[in-house]
Each structure stands twice: as structure tokens, then as C-alpha cells.
Amino acid sequence: SGLEQVSDAGGSPQPLTRFDKGENSHRWPAFLPGGKSLLFAAAFTAANWSAAKVVVQSLDTGERRDLVQGGTNPKYASSGHLVYGQGGSLKAVPFDLRQLKVTGAAVPTVEGVRQSTFNGHVQYSFSNTGSLVYVAGGSQSGQGKLVWVSRNGSEQPLAAPERAYEF
């Protein structure tokens, strides 16, 4: 679904983003410094986050711009870079905060960062001083089997299809 917002004074959620043609999910919102613009990932199919794109949207005007094809879970780094996940790696691209535009080529920064191919989530964060923390692991398919686990640890498979389950 599209993203929604609630005033700091409370009230009902209001639509913030609307799908462009072919989009079916907006996820991983992150405010840019100043709080007047928002980064997010827009996907065309929930099962293919490698085809997602990174988008920026002005909260004042609603104007949006596509920034990166094939990226998800965007964040702004204090170094002046837009950082995002792509295929189990983090990439960084120079970003002009005033013009809300990418100003250079993307470069890989960290390989082997855990990323869900099911929902596009990339497990990383920055501190206020720019330090990066992440979970190692690369792309994870999310395919799993449901089992009963006894108190002694033995597993009994359930008659359920193997697929990406969430909890």
C-alpha cells in the first residue's frame, strides 16, 4: 500500500504517497534532514525487490522523483550520500540535499549485508555521527518450512507449502 502520515497532534492517518503506474508497494520510508522530504522504496511486485526503485517525495508539494532503479531501503548518510540496498550489498551515490537529486555514480560500499528478497528490507542503520552498523548475510530468499518443535528440539514437518513466511 501507499504510505500514510499522522500529524504530531494526532488524528486520522492521511494518504502520503500514491502509486505510479505498475507500483504495488511503498516501503522503508526515511525522512531526509529537515523533515520536509522523504525517501522510500517503490516496488512493482512484492516478490522482486531487485526491480524496485528509490524515490524522493516533497512533503510540502507531493512532488516525487525517481532516484535509483534496482534499490531498496534508502537512507541519507551525513557524508552527503544516498545509501540503499541492492542484491545483498549497500551502495552509495552522491546526493544533493537541496535539489533532491543524485549527482554522481553509485559505488558498492559493503558486500554481504542481509537483505530479504521477500520484502526488500536491508538490515543496516547509521548513527548520528555517521557510523554504520549492519547484519552480515547477503540476500536471503525467505523460503521456509513450517514445523512443530518439541520441547526436546525434535522437529515434525507440517503439511504446508514451502514459501516465504513472515512473523
Per-region residue spans from a language model:
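Beta-propeller blade-edge and WD-like acidic-aromatic loop motif
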Residues: 1-18, 34-66, 80-108, 131-132, ...
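Conserved beta-propeller blade repeats
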Residues: 1-3, 20-41, 63-85, 113-133, ...
